[in-house]
C-alpha cells in the first residue's frame, strides 16, 4: 500500500484526525482547490495546526479519495486520483505529492484538485 493510499484511507475513515499520525510535526503544505470550471481557485497553506484545522472544518461524509496512479522517486511520492461520492460519481481529479521524512511521515505536501479534467483510471 502506498503512502497516499494509507493517508487517504485514514483521512476518509471514521477518525480523520488519525491521518495526522502520518504527518511530520514540521509539515508544510499547499492545497490548490478549484470548486468548478471557472478560473477561480483557492489556496490553503500552512503547518500541522492549519492541516488539523482543515480536518476540523472539512465535510468528509459521503465521499472519499481514490488513488488511480502513483509513483515514488527517493523520498518523494506522487498520486493521481479522484474524489468520488459514495455513489461512485466522480467529484474531481487530484494530483498530490509528498516529501517523506526518515520516519516515512509527510514533511512537505502539495495537492491540486479540479473537477474539470478526468484521467483514465488504472485501478
Identify the residue ranges that each predicted region occupies.
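Short, aromatic-enriched amphipathic alpha-helices that serve as compact interaction elements
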Residues: 1-15
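Aromatic side chains
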Residues: 7-8, 29, 94, 109
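A solvent-exposed, acidic/Ser-Thr-rich amphipathic alpha-helical stretch
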Residues: 17-20, 24-73
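A beta-strand edge to alpha-helix "cap/lid" segment located at domain peripheries
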Residues: 49-123
Amino acid at each position: 500500500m502506498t503512502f497516499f493510499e494509507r493517508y487517504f484511507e485514514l483521512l476518509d475513515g471514521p477518525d480523520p484526525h488519525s491521518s495526522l499520525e502520518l504527518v511530520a510535526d514540521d509539515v508544510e503544505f499547499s492545497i490548490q482547490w478549484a470548486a468548478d470550471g471557472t478560473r477561480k481557485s483557492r489556496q490553503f497553506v500552512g503547518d500541522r495546526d492549519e492541516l488539523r484545522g482543515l480536518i476540523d472544518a472539512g465535510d468528509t461524509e459521503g465521499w472519499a479519495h481514490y488513488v488511480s496512479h502513483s509513483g515514488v522517486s527517493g523520498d518523494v511520492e506522487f498520486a493521481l486520483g479522484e474524489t468520488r461520492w459514495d455513489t461512485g460519481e466522480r467529484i474531481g481529479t487530484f494530483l498530490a505529492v509528498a516529501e517523506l521524512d526518515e520516519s516515512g511521515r509527510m514533511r512537505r505536501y502539495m495537492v491540486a484538485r479540479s473537477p474539470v479534467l478526468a484521467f483514465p483510471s488504472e485501478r
